[in-house]
């Protein structure tokens, strides 16, 4: 919210880079001095409202006000032993449109805010469509919480699948479930399901690992196999795009998958087992990023260890070289 940058360090500290002072702040240090307890930070989830959840080892989690924490204030411990968190393992934290915070744990859902939901079910994925929260567990369970009725109900998924790997809201009406048996779409408008097989003549995997919808409403799916699949839902067009094997820059280990649109509207993709590329919408091809446009061999495709998108539409890459 404030433009500062969270930086979990290699040795488990939660450092906040203050863009005004241009200094790093070890946020948990004052708390550790006071409590004589050292934390090892696993990950940090920053919410749009200006609150961060600092998730540590051994069931310790801290909710931090991103302004007050710079002064060692506004930090609250959440855990099973302080009895304000359902489980000791947090899958994700989500902010809904009312700015309530949903914490999904291995033993149920905790909400910080005005809502309440009584469930011990270990949901792992969450998203919102209009006034409904959708909760999903990897074993194929789907539930809906309605803001108006304040009730949680399970929804039967009639499409064959064993596992849900990821979810995404498509537009304002559709929930997409990435499964081990293709893409399952649920229409919130009429409660109808539709299953899409992502296999093509060049791509035999129906296992969906990641879903993304671009501004042109195309849906992009990462399969297990090399490449990425582009889906145009209205026309049922399906296209497998990949980096030719003889052009793949090998790093000895796998890069993270990456897809985003920059502020000029260019779609960038780092497909499974491929090179960093941009999508040429006219030619419908992935094209490599060249450091010298006159030299087709000057491909720039680093090993991406981590990445983050900033509020200006830039993508920051943490590579093997920095």
Walk through the language-model features, giving the residues of each:
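Carboxylate-rich, polar loop motifs that coordinate divalent cations or form catalytic acidic clusters
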Residues: 1-322
């Amino acid at each position: 919210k404030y433009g500062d940058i969270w930086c979990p360090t290699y040795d488990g500290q939660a450092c906040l880079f203050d863009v005004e002072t241009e200094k790093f702040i070890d946020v948990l240090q004052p708390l550790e001095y006071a409590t004589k307890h050292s934390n090892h930070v696993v990950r940090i989830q920053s919410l749009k409202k200006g609150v961060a959840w600092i998730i540590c080892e051994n069931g310790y989690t801290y909710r931090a006000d991103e302004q007050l924490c710079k002064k060692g204030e506004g930090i609250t411990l959440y855990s099973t032993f302080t009895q304000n968190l359902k489980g000791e393992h947090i899958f994700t934290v989500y902010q809904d449109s009312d700015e309530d915070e949903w914490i999904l744990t291995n033993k149920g859902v905790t909400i910080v805010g005005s809502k309440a939901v009584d469930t011990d079910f270990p949901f792992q994925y969450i998203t919102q469509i209009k006034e409904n929260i959708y909760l999903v567990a990897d074993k194929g369970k789907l539930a809906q919480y309605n803001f108006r009725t304040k009730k949680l109900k399970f929804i039967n998924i009639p499409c064959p699948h064993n596992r849900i790997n990821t979810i995404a809201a498509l537009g304002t009406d559709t929930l997409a479930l990435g499964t081990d048996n293709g893409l399952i779409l649920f229409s919130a408008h009429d409660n109808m399901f539709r299953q899409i097989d992502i296999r093509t003549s060049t791509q035999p995997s129906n296992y969906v690992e990641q879903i993304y919808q671009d501004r042109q409403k195309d849906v992009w799916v990462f399969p297990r196999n090399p490449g990425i699949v582009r889906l145009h839902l209205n026309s049922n067009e399906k296209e497998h795009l990949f980096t030719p094997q003889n052009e793949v820059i090998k790093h000895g280990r796998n890069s993270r998958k990456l897809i985003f649109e920059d502020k000029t509207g260019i779609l960038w993709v780092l497909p499974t087992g491929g090179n960093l590329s941009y999508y040429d919408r006219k030619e419908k091809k992935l094209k490599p990023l060249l450091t010298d446009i006159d030299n087709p061999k000057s491909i720039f495709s680093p090993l991406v260890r981590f990445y983050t998108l900033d509020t200006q539409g830039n993508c920051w890459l943490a590579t093997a070289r920095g």
